[in-house]
Amino acid sequence: MKGFLLFISILMMIGTIVVGKEGYAMDHEGCKFSCFIRPAGFCDGYCKTHLKASSGYCAWPACYCYGVPDHIKVWDYATNKCGK
């Protein structure tokens, strides 16, 4: 039983490492990429195409992406330069 739990734990860690980071997509000015007036499914396609993410959705009013490679920048409150 302990071996099984260890195996499951290792699989979860591998999944976390392989999946990548997550966050809001940014526009060219460093602001969150708006999905306010976009059609359904837009953010999933945008995240996959432009950020090489595994998926995305509209976390109203901005696109939120999952599985973003580490070298791709996503919006971060600490380094926010939007409107500055």
Swiss-Prot record:
Residues with Cysteine amide modification: 82
Main location as per UniProt: secreted
Record carries keyword Cytoplasm: no
GO MF annotations, alphabetized: sodium channel inhibitor activity; toxin activity
Limits of the LCN-type CS-alpha/beta domain: 21-83
Keywords for this protein: Amidation, Disulfide bond, Ion channel impairing toxin, Neurotoxin, Secreted, Signal, Toxin, Voltage-gated sodium channel impairing toxin
Record carries keyword Amino-acid biosynthesis: no
GO cellular component: extracellular region
CDD domains, sorted: neurotoxins_LC_scorpion
Tissue specificity comment: Expressed by the venom gland.
Subcellular location: Secreted
Signal peptide annotation: 1-20
GO biological process assignments: defense response
SUPFAM superfamilies (UniProt xref): Scorpion toxin-like
Its biological purpose: Alpha toxins bind voltage-independently at site-3 of sodium channels (Nav) and inhibit the inactivation of the activated channels, thereby blocking neuronal transmission. This toxin acts on Nav1.2/SCN2A, Nav1.3/SCN3A, Nav1.5/SCN5A, Nav1.6/SCN8A and Nav1.7/SCN9A voltage-gated sodium channels, with the highest affinity for Nav1.3/SCN3A, followed by Nav1.6/SCN8A and Nav1.7/SCN9A which are affected almost equally. Interestingly, shows a significant shift of the voltage dependence of activation for Nav1.3/SCN3A that is characteristic of beta-toxins.
Protein name: Alpha-mammal toxin Ts2
Species per Swiss-Prot/TrEMBL record: Tityus serrulatus (Brazilian scorpion)
